[in-house]
Amino acid sequence: MTILFLTMVISYFGCMKAAPMKEANVRGQGSLAYPGVRTHGTLESVNGPKAGSRGLTSLADTFEHVIEELLDEDQKVRPNEENNKDADLYTSRVMLSSQVPLEPPLLFLLEEYKNYLDAANMSMRVRRHSDPARRGELSVCDSISEWVTAADKKTAVDMSGGTVTVLEKVPVSKGQLKQYFYETKCNPMGYTKEGCRGIDKRHWNSQCRTTQSYVRALTMDSKKRIGWRFIRIDTSCVCTLTIKRGR
């Protein structure tokens, strides 16, 4: 699935003359994650401000189309949920790179950029009103996200329930690249470590719990067989509730 994801991204973004995200010096030179998304200036600097505004609209439509295509392909390759109830989500949280990635995975950036375009089309007053921080919106559970290496993970659980060794480096034509995993988990130092935010403690027991999903990674099993397998990694922090008894 990772190869399919990269192929689709390259096909859509390889012909673009400008990348919409950030400056070129932000990304690592050895990254293989987004080979088609490179910044060589802004749309305004190439064709003027009017061309830039037209380009932003076109990019927004392209991003939406890419996301729809990715979701369609994800539904095709996802295994039978009746036989794999634990395989509830497949994500593109794996990157092969010579150095630590400086940005979240591409789909995270697409969502962030789409939100930016939506905000750019609002008036200043509406924009302030739509800001979650100004509306007092808070997450039920505090979470943290970061890139980790196979050296941090060591081992993982595959789809058959077996424990496999996560290989730190992946051989490529010009040498070796490290495997990086973008993990999201509950923040042990956050304000929700004693329970979920906004829950009535008189009637409910609550707990913020880290949940996992499957990603594809290069691993080695107990019989020393090396191959690409789906393994569990931390991908979200959710609130679990149990009702208090005896009241």
Curated annotation (Swiss-Prot):
GO terms for molecular function: growth factor activity; nerve growth factor receptor binding. Glycans are attached at residue 121. Residues 19-128 form a propeptide. Its main location: secreted. One of its GO terms (biological process) is modulation of chemical synaptic transmission. It is found in: Secreted. The record marks 57-58 as: Cleavage. Residues 1-18 form the signal peptide. Mature BDNF is produced by proteolytic removal of the propeptide, catalyzed by a FURIN family member. In addition, the precursor form is proteolytically cleaved within the propeptide, but this is not an obligatory intermediate for the production of mature BDNF. Can be converted into mature BDNF by plasmin (PLG). Keywords: Cleavage on pair of basic residues, Disulfide bond, Glycoprotein, Growth factor, Secreted, Signal. One of its GO terms (cellular component) is dendrite. It holds the Pfam family NGF. Disulfide bonds join 141-208, 186-237, 196-239. InterPro entries: Brain-der_neurotrophic_factor, Cystine-knot_cytokine, Nerve_growth_factor-like, Nerve_growth_factor-rel, Nerve_growth_factor_CS. Monomers and homodimers. Binds to NTRK2/TRKB. Can form heterodimers with other neurotrophin family members, such as NTF3 and NTF4 (in vitro), but the physiological relevance of this is not clear. BDNF precursor form: interacts with the heterodimer formed by NGFR and SORCS2. Mature BDNF has much lower affinity for the heterodimer formed by NGFR and SORCS2. Important signaling molecule that activates signaling cascades downstream of NTRK2. During development, promotes the survival and differentiation of selected neuronal populations of the peripheral and central nervous systems. Participates in axonal growth, pathfinding and in the modulation of dendritic growth and morphology. Major regulator of synaptic transmission and plasticity at adult synapses in many regions of the CNS. Belongs to the NGF-beta family. This is Neurotrophic factor BDNF precursor form.
